[in-house]
Amino acid sequence: MSISYQDGQTSAGQPAMEHSVPLRRIIPAPVVTRALVGINAAVFVAMVLSGISPTEPNSAQLLQWGANWGPYSLGDQPWRLLTSNYLHIGIIHIALNMWCLWDLGQLSEFIFGRWTLLLIYTACGLAGSIASLWWHPMVIGAGASGAIFGLAGALITALYLGKLPFPRQGFQKTLRSLLTFAGYNLLFGAVGRGIDNSAHVGGLVMGLALGAVIGQFLTDSRESRAGRERFVFMLAAIALVAAGALVKHQRGDVVFLVQGRDALAKGQPDAAIKDLQTTVAKNPKDNAALVLLGNAYLQKKDYVQAEAVLKRAEANDPSDAAVQYNLGLMYQATKRFEPARQIFSKLAQSNPKDDDVWMMLGSSLDGLGRESEAAQAYQQALSLNPKNGEAYRGLGMAYRAQGMKAESDAAFEKAKELGSATKPQ
């Protein structure tokens, strides 16, 4: 965004020919803007030097460096609301954001002052992070966009509504550019993929509010203005804390969801059940939590509870593949092989590239004594994933049941090579 000052009158008060005065000639050095750009750039360079891809950092790397994510930010790591504003997802992301920050930061520093710019930037960045958690608590977020949109919003309302220490008409062109910037990017964020538009909206709303109020103090004496701005930012801090508390109350179940998932992965079903029950109590329609809870009961071999929980999930969404898969596991564990076969047969039709589904179908057919069909299902699983040792083991059992000793021994040997259990005695 190019920013310039349009002087609309001559010193004699007569209309003058329109001319542009470059911003760098009418404001002092933008120290804070340079510092903000420098910090963002330094974080990105440090990430790259640590071995992270400059174009496609993965989720784990972003979380390691302080990205915003509901299960962490709403838990015991709220500092991510701030650090995520200095973290970017690739070189194009940071280049575009720093370009905008450089332009908007200079103008903001000129109009509001250095420390006020820093406080607006920080408050709007936090507002963007909180808004992101409200709409997308399970999406990893990073970038300065919320703070940048906040600067744009503050400039819009200050230039449009504020008491300015310079002729307002000199910034009419800039105001139009700001409105175009905000409108276009909000529209693009709404239709584009992979863009956290909620952070844009959160930052913009905070910026609009701050600019509208602070803009009224721009012609006050330094002492009067400083006191009023302190009060405004105190109110902004209270609003941010209140908004954060509301989001934590309404979306905090994701913290227990991920804690339960992690406990389940560690083989701690009791701890998982405790966390997941908390999640389900807050959101009975959360099928992801219900599936994990059902799986935790399966690990404990509490099949009555597992079936009850998974049936609740099925009632929420009968087409949920994860629900059906876990119901199939439950039916197999309780030796109800026909309903298990029906489930895995349907899943294999809807997702024919999933080797695990074919393997479970083979296991169900094996339980029904349909060994020839079971062998075909295992072979299909192995055609999709030749390293599926459990499928080789199942194939060996199916061959053995048919009296095919050589084929059975070969399948068991392959399963052993891949680290699966050896053939049963």
Language-model features, listed with the residues they occupy:
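A detector for small-residue-rich transmembrane helices and their helix-helix packing motifs
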Residues: S2-A265
